[in-house]
């Protein structure tokens, strides 16, 4: 057991912090051999783990459309924000630009920014899409009920949870519909290139995407609820496969 821990420590020295953090959180009740197997699995697949909220992948399987029918564009009056919040908005916009999440826009559409205080008292950047959502044709794709997901776990003894980092930002919006996501700041006007939080049909599109990607595995070896995935197995060997 001591030898395994020492070897693991040496092998982990060259790994980035976000990967060693995963290793540190492996459950304590794994056997030494199971732990070695889990560590090796994480190391082999380390490029799949995101370093931050802005270290994103991008799928080409779907593109989100925003069907507003014949409704004309609207432009909301610029909302005033407390002076202390303006640097937060500026920083978030700069980070989204750098991550290719948004781009500058000249659009007849414009929704307002809102900052929502999270439990840790930090501020979440959001766009108020309620007016746009009221004009949008709704997607009826079903989202699984959490209680149905839990019942499907059955006799599973091994569970792994995966949370897609900024999952919505990994699916693109159709170029012709991006103007509809426009928002305005003191620095200028921007639009989303990828799925934005708060859009009416974002959950339906993302659930459909995940069900497509994991077709043949859902309800058999994994459960998917939007950007949360549970992998479940009765044995450890099945689990690492």
Where are the regions a protein language model picked out?
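Intrinsically disordered, low-complexity serine/threonine-rich segments
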Residues: 1, 5-12
């Amino acid at each position: 057991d001591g030898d395994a821990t020492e070897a693991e420590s040496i092998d982990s020295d060259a790994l980035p912090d976000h990967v060693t953090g995963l290793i540190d959180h492996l459950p304590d009740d794994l056997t030494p051999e199971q732990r070695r197997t889990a560590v090796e699995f994480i190391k082999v697949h380390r490029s799949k783990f995101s370093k931050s909220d802005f270290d994103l992948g991008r799928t080409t399987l779907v593109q989100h459309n925003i069907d507003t029918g014949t409704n004309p564009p609207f432009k909301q009056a610029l909302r005033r924000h407390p002076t202390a919040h303006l640097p937060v908005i500026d920083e978030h916009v700069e980070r989204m630009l750098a991550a290719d999440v948004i781009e500058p826009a000249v659009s007849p559409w414009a929704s307002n920014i809102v900052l929502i205080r999270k439990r840790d008292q930090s501020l979440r950047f959001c766009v108020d899409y309620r007016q746009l959502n009221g004009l949008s044709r709704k997607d009826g794709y079903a989202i699984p009920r959490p209680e149905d997901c839990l019942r499907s776990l059955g006799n599973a003894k091994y569970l792994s949870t995966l949370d897609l980092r900024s999952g919505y930002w990994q699916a693109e919006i159709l170029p012709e519909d991006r103007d509809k996501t426009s928002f305005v700041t003191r620095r200028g006007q921007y639009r989303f290139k990828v799925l934005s939080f708060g859009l009416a049909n974002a959950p339906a599109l993302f659930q459909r995407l995940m069900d497509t990607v994991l077709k043949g595995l859902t309800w058999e070896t994994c459960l998917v609820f939007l950007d949360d995935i549970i992998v479940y197995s009765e044995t450890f060997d099945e689990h690492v496969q």
